Amino acid sequence: MNPDNPLLALRDKISAVDKKLLTLLAERRLLAVEVAQAKLATHRPIRDVERERALLENLIVLGKAHNLDAHYITRLFQLVIEDSVLTQQALLQKNLNHPHAHAARIAFLGPKGSYSHLAARNYASRHFDSMVECGCLKFHDIIKQVENGVADYAVMPIENTSSGSINDVYDLLQQTSLSIVGELTLPIDHCVLVNGPTDLQQIETVYSHPQPFQQCSQFINRFPHWKIEYTESTAAAMEKVAALNSPKVAALGSEAGGELYQLQVLERNLANQQQNHTRFIVLARKAIEVSDQVPAKTTLIMATGQQAGALVDALLVLRQHNLIMSKLESRPINGNPWEEMFYIDVQGNLQSERMQQALQELQTMTRSLKVLGCYPSENVVPAEPGR
């Protein structure tokens, strides 16, 4: 407390309240683990959307008694519920596949501070007690680390809401024997990171991975005098700027990553789209089993015949079995000009009867068909309170 400065005194009080909130959030997460254990014993689904909706409606009523806005309460507790769902999913999956795994070696793109590094840490924090970090220079190196047994898991970006699909990763999925065992989505907030006092006009050279430059192209175009230099990762760009120690250079990357290199944020929120997220996939040498208590996603890769309507016919099989396709991506087949492979994300468990029936039908009408993996879906669509 600082009685001589009323503003500082109030901030001290706010900090004290924030600490209490953190303690309560941690306590709530522990209760979510107990709920997951109870559901494991009774084989009940992880999600109960009606219960979530009723919870939100009750909290809105309670919030009004404290003059708290309904929209504020809804947004806040949708995040809390999402954390609870993902925590419970992770516990069920660990119990089913790796009940005794406490540490994992995870390969990712770049040194510490890259977005892939942050995604790997997020995944490990939910699924393991600790993580051994295996930073790599290229996507190909990440795959090889796991294939050769140097790492247990690969965390790789697959698509971004602003710049679209990451084709290099899709192409590697054609060639690897690894299976997709998980996914996660990371909010991306690109910043201009500098080593000391400077301004945007004084900067001459900006370093980053090609993806941030694509995602922030509208902001970048405002400074035509900037020289753009590509690096293997955002973390490599931060490392470079930290080493150069010049007011004329900057990096595009995350604030959390910049802190690891003692860089300062000069500008935030650079992306063309306000909602900028990257979806990452997690790969391992062995496929996993997904509990039928958990929402699942299955990723397929297939090549259809060259006749007209072949792809449409294949997709109709999914529709006939009430399977929802959430992603369709095409990539050229190496060595076969004008021929394409199709990557399909389907909402559903590989072991379900309808998925098995659909795969049997697809097998007879495609030139090749491969399941890349079945894994828990981490896209938690928030429940909405009744109007």
Swiss-Prot record:
GO-annotated cellular components: cytoplasm
Signal peptide limits: none
Residues that coordinate or bind substrate: R11, R28, K39, D48, E52, S84, Q88
The reaction(s) this protein catalyses: chorismate = prephenate; prephenate + H(+) = 3-phenylpyruvate + CO2 + H2O
Amino-acid biosynthesis keyword on record: yes
CDD domains: ACT_CM-PDT (cd04905), PBP2_Ct-PDT_like (cd13631)
Record-listed E.C. numbers: 5.4.99.5, 4.2.1.51
Site (Essential for prephenate dehydratase activity) location in chain: T278
GO biological process, one term: L-phenylalanine biosynthetic process
Domain Chorismate mutase positions: 1-92
Amino-acid biosynthesis keyword on record: yes
Compartment(s) where it occurs, according to its Swiss-Prot or TrEMBL record: Cytoplasm
ACT domain segment(s): 299-376
Pfam families linked: CM_2, PDT
Keywords: Amino-acid biosynthesis, Aromatic amino acid biosynthesis, Cytoplasm, Isomerase, Lyase, Multifunctional enzyme, Phenylalanine biosynthesis
Superkingdom, natural source: Bacteria
Domain Prephenate dehydratase: 105-285
GO molecular function: chorismate mutase activity; prephenate dehydratase activity
Pathway: Amino-acid biosynthesis; L-phenylalanine biosynthesis; phenylpyruvate from prephenate: step 1/1; Metabolic intermediate biosynthesis; prephenate biosynthesis; prephenate from chorismate: step 1/1
PANTHER family reported for this sequence: PREPHENATE DEHYDRATASE P PROTEIN (PTHR21022), PREPHENATE DEHYDRATASE-RELATED (PTHR21022:SF19)
Main function: Catalyzes the Claisen rearrangement of chorismate to prephenate and the decarboxylation/dehydration of prephenate to phenylpyruvate.
Protein name: Bifunctional chorismate mutase/prephenate dehydratase
Record organism: Enterobacter agglomerans (Erwinia herbicola)
Gene: pheA
